[in-house]
Amino acid sequence: MIFDLDGTLTDSAEGIVASFLHALEHIGAPVPPGDIVAQIVGPPMDDTFRAMELGDDAEEAIAAFRAEYGARGWAMNALFDGIEALLVDLRAAGVRLAVATSKLEPTARRILAHFGLDQHFEVIAGASPDGSRKAKVEVLAHALSQLEPLPDRVLMVGDRSHDVHGAAAHGIDTVVVGWGYGKADFPDGAPASGVTHAATIDELRRTLGV
């Protein structure tokens, strides 16, 4: 079973948004309109900045974000209620666990270790610092290669549409949790092939059978 990190295991929006705003202030760029959390928490941050038409300032914004997030933003974070107990019960049931996140892998490892969750995961896969691996489909490929031989069934648990699309590219179904940052990705909650919705941790437990 492969878990996303931001918006699935941890409530990380505060630190990500604060670091994002710091980066924009650093280069003198305006804050985009609309729901900032929905726009930036989940997708690769490099892609977010490069899509903002910042020109030559995009790379400087990325560097400023990484510096601020590495210094302070990563710790502005909290576990969602019930997550640790769920992981304990899944492991007790013999389920192999992994993390696949678009966050930089060293940062993901730091966060999971901070919360004492790293012990539960056989594999922690994230984006590479050199940018060669960042899209969800790439991060999932990195995770799956380390899990071989794969079990008969692999399941993704995430909160955003890119979790669903990345998993589907590998033939993996996704459980979309309702406490994350992807509500705008699934506006009508309409059934979709290979996708199950779990609004609460109790619903997720029922879906996973633990």
Residue ranges of predicted features:
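Metal-dependent phosphoesterase signature
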Residues: 50-84
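Active-site neighborhood of HAD-like aspartate-dependent phosphohydrolases
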Residues: 1-38, 55
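Conserved Lys-Pro-Asp/Glu-containing loop-to-beta segment of HAD-superfamily phosphomonoesterases
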Residues: 134-164
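A short, structured active-site edge motif that brings together acidic residues
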Residues: 36, 118-133
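Helix-loop "lid/cap" segments that line or gate small-molecule binding pockets
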Residues: 23, 43-56, 111, 143-144
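Acidic, Mg2+-coordinating phosphoryl-transfer loop and its flanking beta/alpha structural elements
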Residues: 156-196
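Short, acidic loop-to-helix structural element flanking the phosphoryl-transfer center
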Residues: 71-99, 105-109, 137
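Conserved H-loop
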Residues: 30, 55, 117-122, 150
